[in-house]
Amino acid sequence: MSLIPATILTGFLGSGKTTLLKRVLTEAHGQKIAVIENEFGEENIDNDILVADTNEQIIQMSNGCICCTIREDLRATLQDLAQKKRKGELNFDRVVIETTGLADPGPVAQTFFMDDEIAESFLLDSILTLVDAKHAASQLNDRQEARRQVGFADQIFISKADLVSKDELDALTHRLRHMNPRAPQKVVHFGEVGLSEVFDLRGFNLNAKLDIDPEFLKEDEHDHAHHDHVHGEQCDHPSHAHDPASGAGHHHHHDDDVKSFVFRSDRAFDPAKLEDFLGAIVNIYGPRMLRYKGVLNMSGTDRKVIFQGVHQLMGSDLGPKWADGEAKTSKMVFIGIDLPKDIFLQGLEQSLV
């Protein structure tokens, strides 16, 4: 049985996840989609909206977050789905996990790599993050979960853009790009997106494609001075999170704790040195490293080495050969929470041949 693709749909409370999901479920695409819903709270309100006119099977896990309390439940649900599909009791092509607005997508993503049984049945395709343009400024300022959701994204959809001015939208896209230069951004109205922008994005594939927003690279040339704010690491879950409905103003560059930086070099890496260094930083900073990916020039091979990771989980693979005349430039992007950029860049520099 080929692996079942899974998509994690995340985004802050009220950002339009259910609207997007409903569109995906009702569109005539001929795919059978199993949805795992996990809204925060005793009652699941989305149920009434979703079940109205779709015949998809919706598996609900109410009563807590995937990220902390019921991680076990997500694994059990995925195992149950895979088993039923194998036995022919259920027929579906892919899985969408809609996380609660308070969830950190990290542990959800890790489930697909850490659990052998899950990894034998499912392939994590991508993490999609919805951002509510109207309330993004206050949510990103006040909630680390919102910043993490942006940091983890393979694709960012911006909703409610019609409720803010062009300047406010520009400020938001600029801010999101600084937090995550890997994820393309798209403005969506009422969940209207093409399926090709939702499925089969291969965000977790170890492939040679490392998309970094070219605008980000331009800005990266001159570094911004940062004064860091310290935010707690705990995943705290108030039973109700009320966000002040403040507009998305602020044109200055926000000093978010979720930041990204890029390392580039035309010199080859020494494989042993690089392995030692990456092992050490993942050991120390793993919990704060949200996503990282690179296309590397390693001494001793004429092929590109593709590497990527989530928190402490890291993998690498041989990619295609460097083309004739192609500049053998290593490029790595790190997205994380207050990572010590200087230590990373210096250590990578020292791992070169």
Residue ranges and their predicted role:
Residues A34-I36, N91-V96, F122-V131, V150-D162, ...:
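Conserved beta-strand/loop subsegment of P-loop NTPase cores
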Residues P107-E117, K134-R143, V150, I158, ...:
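Non-catalytic interfacial helical region
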Residues K87, A119, E145-R148, H253:
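Structural motif
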Residues Q155, V164-A323, A327, I337-V353:
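C-terminal accessory "lid"/substrate-recognition subdomains
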Residues S2-Q139:
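Nucleotide-state-sensitive switch-loop elements of NTP-binding domains
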Residues L9, I36, D132, S159-K160, ...:
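A secondary-structure boundary/capping signal
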